[in-house]
Amino acid sequence: MPAAKTLHAPYIHTPLPHGHASHGPGACCCGSPMLQQFHERVMADLSRRQVLGGTAAVMAMFAGLSVPSVVSAQPRQANGPLLLTNLQLFDGSGSAVQSGVSVRIEEGRIHSILPADATAEGAEVFDCGGRLLMPGLIDAHWHTTLAAITQTTAMTADVGYIHLVAAQEAKRTLMRGVTSVRDVGGPSFALQRAINEGIVDGPRIFPAGAMISQTSGHGDFRMRHDIPRGSTTPLSEQEHQGVAAIADGEDEVLRRTREQLMLGASQIKLMAGGGVASLYDPLDSTQFTERELRAAVDAAGDWGTYVMVHVYTPRGIQRALRAGVKSIEHGQLADEEAARMMAGEGAWWSLQPFLQDEDSNVYPDAARRESQRQVAEGTVRAYELAQRFDIKTAWG
């Protein structure tokens, strides 16, 4: 997946004492003026093309330090390279943490790893205070308009409110060290543009655009009184907002896929099976025919990208893989045959750690609670299958 191959920007934090898992006075400067200054300094060098290419360098700093003294002691330059010094480097490759190095950043890119005593050579020097420098994190399954609000709020609140909350949450996401997100369905193009143009702060967004769903599928958010739909029936509110696009038949799937590509989708999202939160489709339902799925795969392939699908069951997973789908979202009900097929096709398995605990969603009806139980029980088994069959996994 494109987001998984991105060269990520560094993320800096201070290792916390064993057992310390919460913020305390002097222990963290998430969202501090120093962090904001550093983010603005690096983002100033980025063009829209660099952001889309995944080359932006965005920093987040955690520490027990006196923010005003550090900021005032390190004057800023308007532009130019950065040299990060006095740090420990974790590169995410499995190697041991490195000490005695510095990192040079030029034009928003990590230019080189240098010895600790490397000369600045025109770069602004930023003392990291002995903190750990690590790659920015990827959230591979993110919904711009659902990250901070409930589905009910998303379906009933004013559109402006929804997008303002999304922008606020994007900045919070960046401050947590997540520098790239793969949006897996919804109206994220405007926020992506605002971030790219420096209007608001947030991670790089790889948008999918509207979730493409069959009638009665997991992305069909219409009410019962909206049925039936005739040739002159207007689009539903969720379709107008770009949350979902309903398509039945190969021709409609082609059209809706191409519309999202026209708007700037990095990848395409289809609903290939039932869900827990949806009102109409059973969890074990299989959605879209193989030919419909193949239509989306072909259209995406013509633009050099791929299709991901929401699906849980072995039947749905295998149908999607036969159609050429490259990313399975969820898949907690997969069996060994489906897992083996994912490995054989070289597909990505984008798992989410759904659990039935005190933080899980609360559903009023028994049917959805039962679906939730099945998915939660399947989560541990799915991770075990992914490890056993050496399947490429995405996290989010």
Question: What are the residue ranges of the model-derived segments?
Answer:
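N-terminal secretory signal peptides
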Residues: 1-47, 57-65
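Active-site core of metal-dependent hydrolases
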Residues: 20, 215, 271-384, 388-396
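Boundary at the C-terminal end of the N-terminal hydrophobic targeting segment
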Residues: 71-75
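Histidine-rich, glycine-flanked metal-binding segment
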Residues: 76, 80-82, 89, 93-134
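Short amphipathic alpha-helices and their capping/turn segments at secondary-structure boundaries
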Residues: 123-132, 191-199, 253-265, 334-348, ...
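Metal-associated gating/positioning segment near the N- to mid-region
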Residues: 131-197, 215-224, 291, 315, ...
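Divalent metal-dependent hydrolysis catalytic cores, especially in the metallo-beta-lactamase
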Residues: 165-191, 202-211, 265-278, 306, ...
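Histidine/acidic-residue-rich, glycine-tolerant segments that coordinate divalent metal ions
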Residues: 187, 196-319
